[in-house]
């Protein structure tokens, strides 16, 4: 049995990435303060449909995701359908795979096209760190349920008497891994120590990311894939990512204190992605349908893979596990790739993965391979800057990576690109695209 992955439908049509779009990414409580993930999702999908000049009724499926769930609208995909003029009967469902969520939604739509169930679909993801579901303590939640069942005044009073003042305080969303209690930043510190990633190297990667992102924006290369967003009260608009340090200097990074291990740590706020708001979307079609409608796709999906490892140690190594699977399924080696886009959740995480890509020992002991995945050529790596600069709205990042690498390959005359990301829960995702 061949290890090659056939990312086609029964007619032999490839899965076309027709176009992609995102909102600008904004730091928490700035330009999108008060704007929900759902509203950003509707905004970007509406604009995607408008720019592609496609009748919304043509969309047969929408798969969309968010990581920070909205209790009021748990099926964000269905709400987007209802808010964007699509046919009321359009199939829509929501997914979540932590920071790889829009990788998952893209694959789900692609697989629907591969099976022949649909010809046209939209995938994507949205997250808000500014509109959060603020919870209550477990004791108060338990009491509120009991209160709903209490019949007499005395029973209700007894419930209130067992609550202390601290039980009434609001509980913000958890930032720690449920299984381990470790935050992502603590995991990044863990990885920096395990793989001997220096503070200087982390600072250098962050500086590189911001510098390249600044150059990319100033060149105009992101204009076609980032929309201008107008949000209430409509007194201003945002048309550019606002986390990028346009005057980044390597000296400024050295002044920052460690953020997660104050005494012995090396991971700082500048070498970590900030809490970010934003949304993204990708229009996918079967190759023949795209051409029949007159589109020139920005790329095609060649292969994809997901992975999972233990969460207790270095759980953000997902790219090192998912990438070799995607490469094998594409019949390729790392050196065959034209460009590599890796999510920079933390500089330490990205550098640890890059280091292990080149490690034969890691390949033998962890992957069961005889040779290393390969050494990453920095002339191919995150050439437009990465998440450290652009920011990271959890569910939107995967679609940003896919769209960005396809458009850059198009500008370079074609080739193949790897997009890969780590995710909470020890998860990893990788997708290889080809561009003509």
Curated annotation (Swiss-Prot):
Pathway: Lipid metabolism; fatty acid beta-oxidation. Catalyzes the final step of fatty acid oxidation in which acetyl-CoA is released and the CoA ester of a fatty acid two carbons shorter is formed. GO terms for molecular function: acetyl-CoA C-acyltransferase activity. It catalyses: an acyl-CoA + acetyl-CoA = a 3-oxoacyl-CoA + CoA. GO terms for cellular component: cytosol. This is 3-ketoacyl-CoA thiolase. One of its GO terms (biological process) is fatty acid beta-oxidation. The active site is at residues 99, 392, 422. SUPFAM superfamilies: Thiolase-like. Belongs to the thiolase-like superfamily. Thiolase family. Its EC number is 2.3.1.16. InterPro entries: 3-ketoacyl-CoA_Thiolase, Ac-CoA_C-AcTrfase_FadI, Thiolase, Thiolase-like, Thiolase_AS, Thiolase_C, Thiolase_CS, Thiolase_N. Heterotetramer of two alpha chains (FadJ) and two beta chains (FadI).
């Amino acid at each position: 049995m061949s290890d090659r992955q056939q990312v086609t439908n029964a007619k032999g049509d490839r899965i076309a990435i027709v176009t992609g779009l995102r909102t600008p990414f904004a730091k928490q409580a700035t330009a999108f303060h008060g704007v929900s993930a759902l509203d950003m999702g509707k905004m970007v999908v509406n604009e995607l449909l408008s720019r592609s000049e496609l009748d919304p009724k043509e969309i047969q499926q929408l798969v969309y995701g968010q990581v920070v769930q909205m209790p009021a609208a748990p099926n964000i995909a269905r709400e987007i359908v209802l808010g964007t003029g699509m046919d009321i009967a359009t199939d829509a469902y929501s997914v979540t795979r932590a920071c790889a969520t829009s990788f998952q939604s893209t694959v789900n739509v692609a697989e629907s096209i591969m099976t022949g169930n649909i010809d046209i679909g939209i995938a994507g993801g949205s997250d808000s760190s500014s509109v959060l579901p603020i919870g209550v303590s477990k004791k108060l939640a338990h009491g509120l349920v009991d209160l709903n069942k209490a019949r007499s005044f005395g029973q209700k009073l007894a419930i209130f008497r067992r609550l202390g003042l601290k039980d009434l305080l609001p509980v913000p969303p958890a930032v720690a891994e449920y299984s381990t209690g470790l935050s992502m930043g603590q995991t990044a510190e863990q990885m920096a120590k395990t793989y001997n990633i220096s503070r200087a190297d982390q600072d250098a990667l962050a500086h590189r990311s911001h510098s390249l992102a600044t150059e990319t924006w100033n060149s105009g290369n992101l204009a076609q894939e980032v929309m201008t967003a107008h949000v209430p009260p409509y007194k201003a608009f945002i048309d550019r990512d606002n986390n990028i340090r346009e005057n980044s200097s390597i000296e400024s990074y050295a002044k920052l204190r460690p953020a997660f291990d104050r005494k012995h740590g090396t991971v700082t706020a500048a070498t970590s992605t900030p809490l970010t708001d934003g949304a993204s979307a990708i229009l996918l079609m079967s190759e023949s349908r795209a051409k029949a409608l007159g589109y020139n796709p920005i790329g095609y999906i060649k292969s994809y893979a997901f992975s999972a490892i233990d969460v207790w140690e270095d759980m953000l190594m997902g790219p090192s596990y998912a990438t070799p699977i995607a490469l094998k399924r594409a019949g390729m080696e790392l050196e065959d790739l034209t460009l590599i886009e890796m999510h920079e959740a933390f500089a330490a995480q990205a550098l640890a993965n890059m280091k292990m890509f080149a490690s034969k020992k890691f390949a033998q002991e962890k992957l069961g391979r005889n040779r290393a995945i390969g050494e990453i050529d920095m002339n191919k790596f995150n050439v437009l800057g990465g998440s450290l600069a652009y920011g990271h709205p959890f569910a939107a990042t995967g679609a940003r990576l896919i769209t960005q690498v396809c458009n850059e390959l198009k500008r370079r005359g074609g080739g193949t690109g790897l997009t890969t990301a780590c995710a909470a829960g020890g998860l990893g995702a990788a997708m290889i695209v080809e561009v003509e």
